[in-house]
Amino acid sequence: MNFTYILIAIVVIGVAILLLTLQKRKAEQKKEEKHLEELPKAELLKPHHAEEEKAPAPARAPKVEEVKISFTERLKTGLSRSRQEVWGKLTGLFSGGLDEEKMESLEELLYGADIGTATVSELMTQVHKKAKEGNLTEDSFKQFLFDFLKAKMNPIQEKVDHSLYEFNVSDTGKTKVIMIVGVNGAGKTTTIGKLATKLRTQGASVVVGACDTFRAAAVDQLQVWCDRAGATMIRAKEGSNPSGVGYDALQAALNQKADYCILDTAGRLHTKENLMEELAKSKNVLKKLDPTAPHQILLVIDAITGQNALRQAEEFHKTLDLTGLIFTKCDGSSKAGSAVSIVEQLKLPIAYIGVGETAADLDVFKVDDYLKALLGME
């Protein structure tokens, strides 16, 4: 009995202790919660995102105005090789007067300029005369030479109405037909491309006939030029009749009322008579469509060939009755002076002169500009 009471008492005491402990813990928990509530609320920190450091915008390059170089300047640059390798050697030659030794040096220099034997002979006769007068300096010699060469070229150049060569829209409403001839390698195809480009730039309508049907590469090259210029090109299968292509090109030009019809031609060696006859046939077939065509027949001459070009020119002239010349590649030759004797001997004017690869490097030939660029005169 006593044992039962003792056991009950122990249980009651244990429960009481447990309740007290739980109550104490609950009170402490409330106290802790109250303390936490009384604490200042912490501010929420936004995550820190570093701003991307933008590199400063690159300074805008200053707008470069397109510098348009005049053809006169292009001509000076283009003829620099002839000027430096030949005429530049005049420096110092006249100091102390012209003795016989210096006269011989001057004569050799003039022959090297490729202006022609007859021209040099006549020139030296006058130089001897002026030297005796004792008033021949480097500057006065250049002026004398300028006047002398101009007198040789001007009578031929002035025979021609140079308005024919200007890059203008037709003012007559009639298609102008230009036939371009020359040996392979002289620069015919490139020259035609430049002519077409310059004419199109001035607003003229142009039809080009690719009559050199035996050189596919030349036809493709011409096609590129025409596509860029916006000119119409008439071509045929490789090996087609060249005169037939010329006829078709002129027919297309007339149908379109184009300002110009420019015809490329075969460029085999001038010694092949049958090929020269082929050119004559190409010329004559055009007259079926226009009795006055072609209005110009221009021979392209590579300046590098110098005096050797005379033989070529004579053969072409005899067959086709040329109306003028186009002097090309003057920038790559020291023989640009050969233009003087070629003009004088053939009695044919130079229509255009080329001094580089672009269309801007081809322009109407002007005697004064040419001679000043050749001799290094302002």
Residue ranges and their predicted role:
Residues 1-152, 156, 161-165, 173-174, ...:
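Non-catalytic terminal/linker segments enriched in charged/polar, low-complexity residues
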Residues 118-121, 146, 150-378:
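P-loop/Walker A NTP-binding module and the surrounding RecA-like catalytic core of P-loop NTPases
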